[in-house]
């Protein structure tokens, strides 16, 4: 009975801790600290924009990279590829053959493996494989908090590519962020949801870094 009460108290304390915005600020900053918000036209030039799909904001940013001539092709991927995102990209003026849809990937690892395979199949006008002519420069488009894990997976599953982070959807380092203030210490359900997402990113990063060698 005493152990049961202790477990309840421990669970309550952990839940309360993860409900604090200040905890999310620290966790999120640890993931986003190496990246900055950047206008699409200021992103270094690459060959391919790899949109690790999942939201219209990422789809929009990836399309803007192509329109700004930062990339020649756009590969958008995700679980079944959100048709709304694909339609948005087309509506923004990026269409096939510049746009390539990956409808098979179920996670980030498969996103990258499939994109590598697709790039390896492309040929120059003279028939020479594009991948044989130079190392690919890949603009990796995903949320800022997901970028550390995405870059790790790029090094692991597409090692010959020069991966260039093109982060979007910042959650902590937003230009309009209030930073730490009094309500950073007030628990909320929104903070709990964000903090669990941050925690999941750390777990995913560690799993690929140390367990999946």
Q: PLM features: residue spans?
A:
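Cytosolic-side transmembrane helix boundary signature
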Residues: 1-10
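Structured C-terminal subdomain patch of bacterial secreted/periplasmic proteins
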Residues: 190-213
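A structural signal for short, hydrophobic/glycine-enriched beta-strand patches
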Residues: 12-191, 195
């Amino acid at each position: 009975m005493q152990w049961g009460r202790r477990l309840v108290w421990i669970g309550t304390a952990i839940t309360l801790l993860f409900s604090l915005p200040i905890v999310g600020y620290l966790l999120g900053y640890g993931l986003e600290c190496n990246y900055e918000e950047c206008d699409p036209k200021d992103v270094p030039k690459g060959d391919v924009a790899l949109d690790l799909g999942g939201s219209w904001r990422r789809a929009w940013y990836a399309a803007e990279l192509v329109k700004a001539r930062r990339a020649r092709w756009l590969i958008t991927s995700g679980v079944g590829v959100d048709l709304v995102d694909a339609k948005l990209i087309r509506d923004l003026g990026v269409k096939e053959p510049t746009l390539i849809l990956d409808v098979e990937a179920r996670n980030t690892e498969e996103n990258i493996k499939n994109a590598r395979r697709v790039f390896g199949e492309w040929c120059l006008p003279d028939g020479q494989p594009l991948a044989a002519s130079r190392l690919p420069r890949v603009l990796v488009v995903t949320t800022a908090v997901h970028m550390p894990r995405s870059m790790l997976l790029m090094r692991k599953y597409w090692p010959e590519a020069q991966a260039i982070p093109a982060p979007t959807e910042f959650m902590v380092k937003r230009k309009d962020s209030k930073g730490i203030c009094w309500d950073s210490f007030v628990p909320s359900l929104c903070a709990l949801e964000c903090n669990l997402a941050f925690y999941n990113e750390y777990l995913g990063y560690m799993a690929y870094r140390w367990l999946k060698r």
